[in-house]
Amino acid sequence: MDSIKSNALYLRLPYIKNNYKEIIKEAEMNELSISEFLTDLLQNEADTRFKNGVSTKLRLAKFPHKLYLEDYKLDNYDAGQRKLIKEIMTLDFINNKENIILFGNPGVGKTHLAVGLGIKTCLENKNVLFISVPNLMIEIKEQMTLNQLHRFKKRFEKYDLVILDEMGYISFDKDVSEVLF
């Protein structure tokens, strides 16, 4: 039995490593065929890996709050705006490599919608970064000073969705705005 645990560890199969004894008992109790046993075992491992991947993506996205699309209120919008927001919620804009800009008065829910879109994107196993524009500008300036701007820009290629928040609250430095836009 120890060889199962050590091999699962070596092969990076955390579900099997942590649960193999119970899985074997359950398979014996239910008289599963080898095929059924392996199918269940590998499906559980895949599910665990997917869940762990999503958890990592959510953590690395750096969302300021957990805000979900299911909790987003569409009551304050007219029919045309509701239709557009529902279309955005499909995330088709990501697959189409389109940009969207959410703008409006403070307190209308732009950040809630943006974070909700980001969380939904993570749940689809895609990479997201949430960053405020003031913090991004600070990072850009630092990278310009260190002559690391090319590497910094390259980092953004791994993201399926980059959410820039608080764009309207700052004045733009000329050099930084050329990089940003």
Regions found by a protein language model. Name each.
Residues 5-64:
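Interdomain "pre-motor" coupling segment immediately N-terminal to P-loop NTPase/helicase cores
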Residues 61-73:
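Conserved adenine-nucleotide phosphate-binding loops and their immediately adjacent elements
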Residues 77-88, 128-157:
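Short glycine-rich substrate-engagement loop in P-loop NTPases that contacts/grips substrate
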Residues 89-97:
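Phosphate-binding P-loop
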Residues 98, 125-127, 158-161:
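Loop/turn-to-beta-strand initiation segments
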Residues 101-128:
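Walker A/P-loop
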Residues 148-181:
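Conserved nucleotide-sensing/catalytic segment adjacent to the nucleotide-binding pocket
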